[in-house]
């Protein structure tokens, strides 16, 4: 049974982590509530990310371009490319995310969930957690 991680307006169901696949992939389903967005745009140098739309429409900002991903549609985000996402609709959206190679596992998201559960998260702690796992945060003004 997939592990569920609650990140406020985001919910992840982790199917496979790096330890399950000998580092080949991380795979999780993400539900994004209406009007929610990724709190901190970022990039990563060690893995690529593929997103497959399952339900609703999520808007991904990739390398300065908005890309709408609906059911059956995909976006590929290669390493080093700044990205973020939002749900600009009034309905929850779902997508399947695959990171290759698998380097995060669920622990990064669990650590972020702890920071978010404490109320308004400390931006410095969020940045430190991101950097520890290889995500490089970028100011929203640069996206």
Language-model features: where?
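A short glycine-rich, His/Asp/Glu-containing loop-to-beta-strand
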Residues: 5-41, 47-48
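Structural signal for conserved beta-strand scaffold positions within catalytic alpha/beta enzyme cores
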Residues: 6, 14, 97, 137-139
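Short strand-coil-strand connectors
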Residues: 8, 61-65
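Short, conserved beta-strand element in jelly-roll/cupin
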Residues: 29-33, 43-61, 98
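Short acidic-glycine-tyrosine-enriched beta hairpin
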Residues: 64-82
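Ligand-binding loop in jelly-roll beta-barrel domains
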Residues: 79-106
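Acidic/histidine-enriched, glycine/proline-rich intrinsically disordered or flexible terminal extensions
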Residues: 110-143
